[in-house]
């Protein structure tokens, strides 16, 4: 069974550079490569009957009876372990990313244990497919996932986010059948690694907090709260382990200090705040840099020269060989609703790729992003994997080439996006969608060709650096 170990970044509309809401996540797998694709699920393609592959959980048809909306997704292309839709934006400009694998503790597992997959229940395989096509607001996502978790249960610990043009909500599942959610303030950002992240919680503030109806009673009845005052959900339901200090907390610490150099602290800090404010407005480039980061300019950078070999292996970076798909789901507020939804997407290790902004009001995706299960250099997923594995052999040489490639690609995509926004201003219906499909194709071709060019530059630079060589000076 695949489990993804991700890094989620959330940015409220007053914290972003252009007034948009942004929810982002890197989808990281394990030692086996998991090819990811990009597709549009049109209403006629949405399942009317659904059974999970992993848990064999059958969903009651009544829970799929509502007319589904069109939505984008980034599924596993093999389908062997289910759909794993990962992230997308639907026709009502509601976005969802799911899931972040998070932590738990023995106290709550002794009260409401997660299910064994043999018992049924839902997991990361299922949530996007069963949720996103039925949402008309971000809070609808909280309500629907809460309902599904209470009814069917879950065999995993899950974190997920929902957004519309105004609001972002982050939800975490608790045990097998409970959940909590918090609205992210408009002027705030969140960094959520693979641990239970929500901290302070106000049961009396229904505008900003939501939960399974019996959760407060459950906390009190089973004496789950270690704090003398208030409710800190990370303390109650989460973890504070040595693994957190090496695997989770350092990722958050590094990005907090990138967004606010006065943040301070140490990488292992267990109580880093969930809700934070940056010292500037946050851009797409900031989020991509964060999702690509590997502790640059610290002793913990595996590519750097400041640390010892031991220090370089101390903490897990965000940018890693196991990044298979990364997205930023952006709902813009300065353009018409028909072009407001943008799914920024990249495949492969983030340190060596570039994102591009796909319009989501479309009915199909570029061929290069419809990944094949087997290696195929016509597909951007496999081209990025090859580029990253070559780049990793000598980052000092290849890193500057990648930086130039990424800046060039982002600039070209921004230009295409600006031009398209203006060109389609007075269009609607199929004519509009056709223009957006064409713009997506143009950006896809641009980034694909730039990646091929980068690979060629890396081959040129690396020719003289091979170990197997013998120079004849004659």
Curated annotation (Swiss-Prot):
<comment type="subunit">
    <text>Homooctamer.</text>
</comment>
<feature type="active site">
    <location>
        <position position="6"/>
    </location>
</feature>
<dbReference type="GO" id="GO:0016805">
    <property type="term" value="F:dipeptidase activity"/>
</dbReference>
<dbReference type="GO" id="GO:0070004">
    <property type="term" value="F:cysteine-type exopeptidase activity"/>
</dbReference>
<dbReference type="Pfam" id="PF03577">
    <property type="entry name" value="Peptidase_C69"/>
</dbReference>
<dbReference type="GO" id="GO:0006508">
    <property type="term" value="P:proteolysis"/>
</dbReference>
<protein>
    <recommendedName>
        <fullName>Dipeptidase A</fullName>
        <ecNumber>3.4.13.19</ecNumber>
    </recommendedName>
</protein>
<comment type="function">
    <text>Hydrolyzes a wide range of dipeptides but unable to hydrolyze dipeptides containing proline. Highest activity against Met-Ala.</text>
</comment>
<dbReference type="InterPro" id="IPR005322">
    <property type="entry name" value="Peptidase_C69"/>
</dbReference>
<keyword id="KW-0378">Hydrolase</keyword>
<keyword id="KW-0645">Protease</keyword>
<keyword id="KW-0224">Dipeptidase</keyword>
<comment type="similarity">
    <text>Belongs to the peptidase C69 family.</text>
</comment>
<dbReference type="InterPro" id="IPR047804">
    <property type="entry name" value="C69_dipept_A-like"/>
</dbReference>
């Amino acid at each position: 069974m695949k489990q993804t170990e991700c890094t989620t970044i959330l940015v409220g509309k007053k914290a972003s550079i252009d007034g948009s809401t942004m929810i982002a996540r890197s989808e990281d797998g394990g030692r086996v490569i998991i090819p990811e694709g990009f597709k549009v699920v049109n209403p006629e393609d949405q399942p009317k009957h659904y059974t999970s592959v992993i848990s064999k959980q059958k969903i009651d048809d009544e829970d799929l009876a509502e007319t589904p909306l069109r939505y984008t997704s980034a599924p596993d292309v093999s389908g062997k372990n289910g759909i794993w839709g990962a992230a997308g934006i639907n026709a009502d400009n509601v976005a969802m990313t799911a899931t972040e694998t998070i932590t738990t503790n023995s106290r709550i597992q002794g009260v409401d244990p997660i299910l064994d997959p043999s018992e049924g229940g839902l997991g990361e395989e299922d949530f996007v497919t069963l949720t996103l096509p039925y949402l008309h607001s971000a809070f609808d996502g909280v309500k629907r996932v809460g309902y599904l978790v209470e009814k069917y249960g879950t065999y995993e610990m899950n974190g997920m986010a929902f957004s519309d043009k105004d609001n972002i909500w982050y939800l975490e599942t608790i045990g097998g059948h409970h959940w909590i959610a918090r609205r992210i303030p408009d002027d705030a950002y969140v960094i959520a690694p693979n641990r239970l992240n929500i901290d302070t919680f106000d049961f009396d503030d229904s505008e900003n907090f939501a939960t399974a109806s019996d959760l407060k009673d459950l906390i009190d009845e089973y004496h789950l709260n270690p704090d003398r005052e208030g409710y800190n959900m990370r303390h109650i339901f989460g973890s504070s382990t040595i693994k957190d200090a090496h695997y989770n907390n350092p990722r958050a610490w590094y990005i907090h200090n990138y967004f606010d150099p006065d943040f301070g602290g140490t990488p292992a800090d267990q109580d880093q705040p969930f809700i934070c404010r940056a010292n500037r407005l946050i851009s797409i480039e900031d989020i991509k840099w964060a999702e690509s980061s590997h502790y640059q300019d610290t002793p913990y950078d595996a590519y750097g020269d400041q640390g010892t070999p031991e220090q370089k292996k101390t903490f897990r970076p965000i940018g890693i060989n196991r990044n298979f798909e990364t997205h930023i789901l952006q709902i813009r507020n300065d353009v018409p609703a028909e072009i407001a939804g943008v799914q920024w997407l990249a495949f492969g290790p983030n340190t060596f790729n570039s994102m591009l902004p796909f319009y989501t009001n479309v009915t199909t995706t570029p061929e290069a992003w419809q990944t094949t299960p087997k290696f195929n250099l016509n597909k951007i997923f496999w081209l990025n994997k090859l580029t990253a594995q070559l780049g990793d052999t000598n980052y000092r040489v290849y890193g500057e080439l990648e930086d130039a490639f990424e800046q060039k690609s982002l600039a070209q995509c921004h230009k295409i996006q600006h031009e398209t926004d203006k060109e389609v201003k007075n269009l609607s219906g199929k004519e509009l969608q056709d223009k957006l499909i064409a713009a997506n194709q143009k950006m896809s071709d641009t980034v694909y060709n730039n990646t091929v060019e980068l690979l060629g530059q890396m081959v040129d630079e690396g020719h003289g650096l091979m170990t197997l060589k013998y120079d004849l000076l004659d």
